[in-house]
Amino acid sequence: VRSRRQRQMCIRDSTRDAWEDTFEILDTEGVPTNTVFHCFTGGPDEAKEGLQRDIYLSFSGIVTFPNAPELRDALAITPSDRYMVETDAPYLAPVPQRGKPNQPAWVLHVGEKMASVRGIELNQLAEESWRNASHFYGLDG
């Protein structure tokens, strides 16, 4: 983490059931300018902790799972300039494709669910997430 921060490189973090440790490490070493919680699995509390540190949250097919209401609550409180959409293919296929190897084309299912949770049109979600990803990866000029 320290090396990436010093070199101004992004971090794509995949935290699973280790939020306290993750935040402690980030606070100790310093949060790199562009950090994203890839395949975010936390709830509203973890989202708030990450957002307070200017971390992006990237949502995968898990957001479509019936047993993920806390993840959807986290999505609902995420500002429009701090989220991204992903599939995590070949894993975590979204509803209605559960049980199959995931594929990039199914990002549409993830986006549709995210737009519904946020109460916005799919086009708006696509524009916001594209702008966020472009900024994160330095593709916005």
Residue map of PLM features:
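Glycine- and Gly-Pro-enriched alpha-helical subdomains that act as flexible
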Residues: 12-29
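Mid-to-C-terminal alpha-helical segments outside catalytic/metal-binding sites
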Residues: 105-141
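Short acidic/histidine-rich active-site segments
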Residues: 81-103, 125
